[in-house]
Amino acid sequence: CATKYPILMVHGVFFRDFRYLNYWGRIPAELEKNGTVIYYGNHQSAASVADSGAEIAARIREVLQETGSEKVNIIAHSKGGLDSRYAISRLGMAPYVASLTTINTPHRGCEFADYLLNLIPKKQKNAVAAAYNATLKKLGDDNPDFLAAVGDLTASACRKLNEELQDPAGVYIQSTGSCLKHASGGRFPLNLTNRFVHLFDGENDGLVGEASFRWGEAYT
């Protein structure tokens, strides 16, 4: 199905847009086969919502300049949905975005993330963050910030974000999501985290509770 505007696909946290390892599986190829023009966010894998949102805003401008299109449609997964909302509502991208579709995005955050960040001592958190940041830098991030990325996924941070961001008129926003029915049915590490997340967030995909998925005019 050819679309009027190109599609910008925005990945979630701790992933990159690699040429030979597609984050989105077979979805882009199927869309392109039917005439859709696909672009990728090409943003860092671990950064605050504000920093990632700025990268997405810059990427939108690049796509518009390259294609001559007036707008883009955004499909965003996980934290990418928060990053895209920030770009649209805070950074002036609303006139250039026709629609935003979020997939398993923690719009209301993850209570489990609050619990972990409050439980783990600062010294241990910094050690884990340093290890992740070193790895992510090798994978292509210029300035990875593990703690900023995780911190912005907490329920407390998302409550504040939702108070600050107003969905603009003129951008169609919809959401979708899926949950693991059985922990054994998920891939590592989601099969391990599913039961723990359930204690705090109910039905979930291994990281994000279903109650957080819904945002916008339609939810499926």
Label for each model-derived stretch:
Residues 2, 92-95, 165-168:
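Short, conserved loop/helix-junction motifs that constitute active-site signature segments
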Residues 11, 38, 54-157:
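Serine-dependent carboxylesterase/thioesterase catalytic core
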